[in-house]
Structures are given as structure tokens and as C-alpha cells.
Amino acid sequence: MITIDGSYGEGGGQILRTSIALSAITGEPVRIINIRANRPNPGLRPQHLHGILALKHLANADVKGAHVGSRELVFIPKRLEAKKVEVNIGTAGSITLVLQALLPAMAFAKNRVEFKITGGTDVPWSPPVDYLANVTLFALEKLGIMAGIKIVRRGHYPKGGGIIEGYVEPWKERRELVATKYSSIAKVEGISHATNLPAHVAERQAKAAKEELSKLEVPVKIKTEVSKSLGPGSGIVVWAETDCLRLGGDALGKRGKPAEVVGKEAAQELLEQLKPGYCVDKFLGDQLIPFLAFSGGEIWVSEVTNHLKTNIWVVENFLGKVFDLDGEVGKPGKVKVVRRVE
């Protein structure tokens, strides 16, 4: 059994997500200690617990220590064979963080897996669902992974109640991904949404982002969306379509924060990611690591993050030496697969 120290690096929930996904994929039991040791409220939070329970169902696993506040967990997987996964986080816990744990494992299942997750679609400290649908899945398709996500209803902090549905097909053809420097940007697209708020909020966010992005001198098209849910909230995600991948930027609205500031923030984030001229933004880099181990290739990231380094560390705990990382945290960097896992 592999033992993973959950206090490594920034000691967050990501160690947990990646460890359990890899355990499910490899069939290798795992024991995780010191879970989220470096966080103000250590141990499992509801969204981690629901991700674990979904992976338990997916991998037919035996699990010990799966309760809120638990600092140690044992996960013993059997077979990846479930065809349907339903998760109700029960709070505004992040849907996309639960999906980050599920996606790699679902890609290795024997059959197509359909999923439905209830929780927060657009919440602080996690990728918004529009980013996952338009940037992450676009990159995974290049690796040969076919998946789709549909937003049924948005959910914001604190009420949640967002619903997404989707599917992942079995990963049949593993395509190497070489995404180094981009040479051109074709266009920028985006989605600006307002939930239980006036339509002008979404429109003002979009307009401010568009103005900021005009300096790229490419077509910019941002859709606006107005919807109803359990509570109010707004946000915007913008992404640049380059000749290799898409890079993204996003921002969330909050009470007292003008819509113009929200739109400008997302646009500036995207411009920041585009600056180094590399194909992979800092949010996508760490998400790709578990998949890259099996596909092979090389990615150049606009910024090396602690999340990226931590994910490499977890993957190599399971699979041995796989990656070479050139670059330090906070700076652009290069990740190369030196040994692809069959």
C-alpha cells in the first residue's frame, strides 16, 4: 500500500484528489495521512468527502476514514466499472474540484460514465465550470479524451444548488500532447453570467472585459447569460483560442464589487496568462499532469504553481519518475514527460 503524506507542499485537498484518482486507475491501495494539515480547518471537508464517495462507487472500493474532519484515509480500489455517478455536495462546495478527482478515473473506466453533480458551479478558490467546459475539456480532447459538460443550473456561495451533468467516454487512443509556444491567437470567447440579478450585471461584465481585451486586436465574442437559482451571483470566464490550446481568465462578482471591475479582472487575468507566449495557462497546468503521465508529451506553462509541483510529486509517488520540470514557482516553466506510463 502506498502512503501519501497529505501535508506535503501546500498540503491542500489536491493531494487527496490526485492520490485517490491514481489509486482507482492503477488498482494500487493508498493510505493518506495528515489530510489538509496546513489548512485552517484541517481534515476532510464535505466536497472532499463527496469526491471520495463518488470514486468509491466508481472503483468499487473499500474505504476507511471517510468522514468530515478525518485526517487519515485508506482507499482500496477494485474495478472501475460504474456507469453512472451522482454526487450531491449538499453545500456550495466546488463541483469542479470534485470533477478534478473524477475525470482521470472516469477516463480509465471500461464503459462510458455519465455523471450528475450538485453543489457550487462558480465559487471562490476553484475553477468555474465554464473554464472546465471550455478550456480543460478542449485540452483533454487533444489527448484523445471525449467528454462533455452541461450546466443545468448555476450555484454560488453560500447557497449552492448548482447542477451539472456530463459524460466521459473510455480513453481508447492516447495521443501525445506537445503544447509549447503559441504563434497566433485566432479569437477570444467568453461567457458572462448573472444569476438572480439584473441582466445589466452580465452585460456590464462582458463590456468591460471586451474593452480590456481589445488590445489583442483579435475578434472578441462574450455571450451573456441570465438565470435563476437558489441565490444570487455573477461571474465571467474568457478564453483565447491559440494555434495550440486555449488559455483562460476568470473572475467572480460579489456584493459591493462593480460589474466593470469583475469583467476587467477576468480580462487582465487572461492577458497575464498570454504574456509569456506559452500554450498552457497556470490553471490548466496542474490539471493536465495526471493525464500527461499516460499520454506522454511536453507542456510549457505560463506559470509554475505549487499545485503543479504537488501533482507531479503525487503522480511520481504512484508511478515512479515520469516528469522533468524546468522552472520555479511563480515563473513560466516547462514540463516534459521523460517516461510515459503504459
Curated annotation (Swiss-Prot):
Residues of the signal peptide: none
Active site residues per record: H307 (tele-amp-histidine intermediate)
Pfam families with a match to the protein in the record: RTC, RTC_insert
One Gene Ontology cellular component: cytoplasm
EC number of this enzyme: 6.5.1.4
Enzyme class: ligase
InterPro entries registered for this protein in UniProt: RNA3'-term_phos_cycl_insert, RNA3'_phos_cyclase_dom, RNA3'_phos_cyclase_dom_sf, RNA3'_term_phos_cyc, RNA3'_term_phos_cyc_type_1, RNA3'_term_phos_cycl-like_CS, RNA3'P_cycl/enolpyr_Trfase_a/b, RPTC_insert
Ligase keyword on record: yes
Top-level taxonomic group: Archaea
Catalytically driven reaction(s): a 3'-end 3'-phospho-ribonucleotide-RNA + ATP = a 3'-end 2',3'-cyclophospho-ribonucleotide-RNA + AMP + diphosphate
UniProt-annotated binding residues for ATP: Q100, F283, L284, G285, D286, Q287
Family membership: Belongs to the RNA 3'-terminal cyclase family. Type 1 subfamily.
Protein's name according to its UniProt entry: RNA 3'-terminal phosphate cyclase
Lineage: Archaea, Methanobacteriati, Methanobacteriota, Thermococci, Thermococcales
Gene: rtcA
